[in-house]
Amino acid sequence: MIKHISLDFWNTLMVSNKIFSKLRLDFLKKEFFQNISIEELSIQIETIGDESDTINMKEGISIPSEVMYQRLFSKFDLEITTTQAEKIYNDLEVLFLDNPPISIYDLDELKRYLKALRNNGYTTNISSNTAFIKGRTLKKIFNDYDLLDYFDFLIFSDEINSSKPSSKFFKELEKECKNLNVSKNSILHIGDSFEADIKGAEAFKIKSKLINIDDKKLIQLLIGLEN
């Protein structure tokens, strides 16, 4: 019997804000890459993101955001220190918070169904891999959207140095659920990535459900659980 719902974040609940993506490019070009085209810079940011995701998922680690920015600079034969990378992150965080991720669903409707689940005895959490954006920043988004009260805990890969689909990540989920007196066989993990969310959960003997961002079926799924 399902008693706990674990939700992925990116492309399950929210998508990145294109305005932030543009402002990040503008900031980096103006401050550091004046001789690099926006197009080339965009390609390399995407490449670093893809490369990092592949490594994280294959090795079960979580490459820090600072290292990702250092690798971006190295693509153009430039070097920055960890301190400089931290400064860049902090500057970009301001832009990110001003142009936050966009909810796939109507937030009031999502909150209503999450509240109904919790009123029916379910516990809930977020289980998310991170990349350029740290968990600490995403927590600020949850606070700004008044979503924190709808989840018992949040797991972000950078905070445990482990990414889905690794068993270490899902072991953390199991541990947190045990603190709520919920056993592993009572957890349902929901996400959009077959590799990270479904295969990872199933390898750790946790039930899972794949949803497609284009279908927008999460609300229907939550209604089904409620009933």
Give residue ranges: language-model regions.
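Asp-based, Mg2+/Mn2+-dependent phosphohydrolase catalytic module
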Residues: 1-7, 15-18, 33, 39-40, ...
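N-terminal helical cap/lid subdomain that shapes the substrate entry/recognition surface
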Residues: 2-106, 120
